[in-house]
UniProtKB/Swiss-Prot annotation:
The keyword Repeat applies. Pfam families: TAXi_C, TAXi_N. Keywords: Aspartyl protease, Glycoprotein, Hydrolase, Protease, Repeat, Secreted, Signal. Disruption phenotype: No visible phenotype. It is found in: Secreted. CDD domains: pepsin_A_like_plant (cd05476). This is Probable aspartic protease At2g35615. Residues 1-20 form the signal peptide. Residues 85-439 form the Peptidase A1 domain. It is an enzyme of class 3 (hydrolase). GO terms for molecular function: aspartic-type endopeptidase activity; endopeptidase activity.
Length: 447
């Protein structure tokens, strides 16, 4: 069976909400778009077609990152409004359940709101701000309004209401009011956790390619207006996730752990936990690590890619933070010059198969066997202070019974450490100490 997709989202926290009465540990359930539990699941689509669609989304997402890193006009960089996971939250008083796309590449959460000027078809109820006793518009001079970029915010001066506007590269868009509201998250234990005064976008003018099963976007990036950034002290600025390669085609769901006890423990010598620093860079939405080298078997290849941070002359500078870790991107994208050396080492190390072309033309290095079993090399990723040894499912994807492809591709833009490379790891984020930890784990046992 072909290797399955499981993408997840990051959560990033800072203090903006009161943590009084909130648990220090809880879990949130996510439903993958390709899971049989997903509202957009189509049993007629083959596993191979699902994989190819995910690969194409990886390319689109990397372009979006590149635009946001290299342009000041963020609207031109928002490419694609689809996502890999749906997340359920409730909003307002009385509460209305909304089912929205979880997106690590966005900060402000927005949902469709009545009264609509233009709203796309939605299967569930649309949030009506007039029926909620806890809805409150944000004034134009508020800190939360000013946290939006100049291209994303506006002002209704006659009513002193802050406005947001998001325009995506696939012609999707959302416009509306910035407001605060009570948001509740259904934890995996079954008990909802409520956060009053959460900043969000109340979208009354929305259209494009949004799926009718979703109410909007849940912003899970690292910026100040991210839903998760607003929860900060409520979960001690710690979270972890475990991505299982099985859950995209089973009735299992993905669970992200939030709070003090969510981080991999390194107290035991046999824990296998390794940690690497998070690098602080703009824009805050993304999570930057420093990649030093990748080993293929015993051959260690120094990473030659620059961090995508052009200086005033448009020249890339050799600094730390040269790769973004992102669970919303399926593939791993590596600097083209380095990739040539790395992929050559992989090709030399594969046994029992010959190199062939990917039938879809999406992956650069595929290998096909006759009747023999394909021998794949061990690959180790060397981040600063952390050597992460990958399993075959982390570096290769099985497209058929006799063909596998390297799930890493070259790029001339921003490097991304993608979802496949993170499967069956407990990946922990300690945003107080600014570290990311990795620990091998059977994630299917933790769903």
């Amino acid at each position: 069976m072909a290797t399955q997709i499981l993408l997840c989202f990051f959560l990033f926290f800072s203090v903006t909400l009161s943590s009084s009465g909130h648990p220090k540990n809880f879990s949130v359930e996510l439903i993958h778009r390709d899971s049989p539990l997903s509202p957009i699941y189509n049993p007629q689509i083959t596993v191979t077609d699902r994989l190819n669609a995910a690969f194409l989304r990886s390319v689109s997402r990397s372009r979006r990152f590149n635009h946001q890193l290299s342009q000041t006009d963020l609207q031109s960089g928002l490419i694609g409004a689809d996502g890999e996971f749906f997340m359920s939250i409730t909003i307002g008083t009385p509460p209305i359940k909304v089912f929205a796309i979880a997106d690590t590449g966005s900060d402000l959460t927005w949902v469709q709101c009545k009264p609509c000027q233009q709203c796309y078809k939605e299967n569930g109820p649309i949030f009506d701000k007039k029926k909620s006793s806890t809805y409150k518009s944000e004034p134009c001079d508020s800190r939360n309004c000013q946290a939006l970029s100049s291209t994303e915010r506006g002002c209704d001066e006659s009513n002193n209401i802050c406005k947001y506007r998001y325009s995506y590269g696939d012609q999707s868009f959302s416009k509306g009011d910035v407001a605060t509201e009570t948001v509740s998250i259904d934890s995996a234990s079954g008990s909802p956790v409520s956060f009053p005064g959460t900043v969000f976008g109340c979208g009354y003018n929305n259209g494009g390619t949004f799926d009718e099963t979703g109410s909007g976007i849940i912003g899970l990036g690292g910026g100040h207006l991210s839903l998760i950034s607003q929860l900060g002290s409520s979960i001690s600025k710690k979270f972890s996730y475990c991505l299982s390669h099985k859950s995209a085609t089973t009735n299992g769901t993905s669970v992200i752990n939030l709070g003090t006890n969510s981080i991999p423990s390194s107290l035991s010598k046999d824990s296998g936990v390794v940690s690497t620093p998070l690098v602080d860079k703009e824009p805050l939405t993304y999570y930057y690590l420093t990649l030093e080298a990748i080993s293929v078997g015993k051959k260690k290849i120094p990473y030659t890619g620059s961090s995508y941070n052009p200086n005033d002359d448009g020249i890339l500078s050799e600094t730390s933070g040269n790769i973004i870790i992102d669970s919303g991107t399926t593939l791993t994208l590596l600097e083209a010059g380095f990739f040539d050396k790395f992929s050559s080492a992989v090709e030399e190390s594969v046994t029992g198969a010959k190199r062939v072309s990917d039938p879809q033309g999406l992956l650069s290095h595929c290998f096909k066997s006759g009747s023999a079993e394909i021998g794949l090399p061990e690959i180790t990723v060397h981040f600063t202070g952390a050597d992460v040894r990958l399993s075959p499912i982390n570096a290769f994807v099985k497209l058929s019974e006799d063909m596998v492809c390297l799930s890493m591709v070259p790029t001339t833009e921003v490097a991304i450490y993608g979802n496949f490379a993170q499967m069956d790891f407990l990946v922990g984020y300690d945003l107080e100490t600014r570290t990311v930890s990795f620990q091998h784990m059977d994630c299917s046992a933790n769903l």
